[in-house]
């Protein structure tokens, strides 16, 4: 039963990050979440359009 809730939590987290990424679009270069002793960091590596 616990794994079912953990799976739902991971799916909700992924959907939240995906939604946030779609909302901010091109202005997102780095996203960091710090929670007690856990740090989640996403960095977007890209080449600007010329």
Curated annotation (Swiss-Prot):
Signal peptide: none annotated. It is a single-pass membrane protein. Keywords: Cell inner membrane, Cell membrane, Membrane, Toxin-antitoxin system, Transmembrane, Transmembrane helix. It is found in: Cell inner membrane. The keyword Cell inner membrane applies. Toxic component of a type I toxin-antitoxin (TA) system. When overexpressed kills cells within minutes; causes collapse of the transmembrane potential and arrest of respiration. Its toxic effect is probably neutralized by an antisense antitoxin Sok RNA. This is Protein HokE. It comes from Shigella flexneri. The gene is hokE.
């Amino acid at each position: 039963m616990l794994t079912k809730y953990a799976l739902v939590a991971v799916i909700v987290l992924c959907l939240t990050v995906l939604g946030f990424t779609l909302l901010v679009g091109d202005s997102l270069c780095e996203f960091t979440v710090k929670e007690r002793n856990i740090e989640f960091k996403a960095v977007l590596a890209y080449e600007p359009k010329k």
